[in-house]
């Protein structure tokens, strides 16, 4: 069974917000937090089961969503 993917939304290094899959070396950058969160939630929903975590600049968890597998 595969590990549940976690998509993390965090403040960008200079400005804006970034989204990455845990363990990935690539990020997607957005100027607005709302857009970054929406992107991460859509990404997680398409890859159920999955979770989305929004982190502060200090690394604290600000919000989290869990997407369960589709029911048969």
Protein language model regions, located:
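A short local loop/turn or secondary-structure capping micro-motif enriched for an aromatic residue
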Residues: 27-28, 37-38, 70-72
């Amino acid at each position: 069974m595969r590990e549940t993917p976690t998509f993390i939304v965090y403040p960008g290094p200079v400005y804006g917000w970034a989204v990455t899959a845990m363990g990935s070396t690539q990020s997607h950058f957005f100027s607005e937090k709302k857009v970054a969160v929406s992107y991460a939630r859509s990404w997680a929903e398409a890859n159920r089961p999955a979770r989305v975590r929004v982190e502060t600049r200090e690394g604290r968890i600000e919000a989290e969503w869990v997407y369960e597998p589709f029911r048969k």
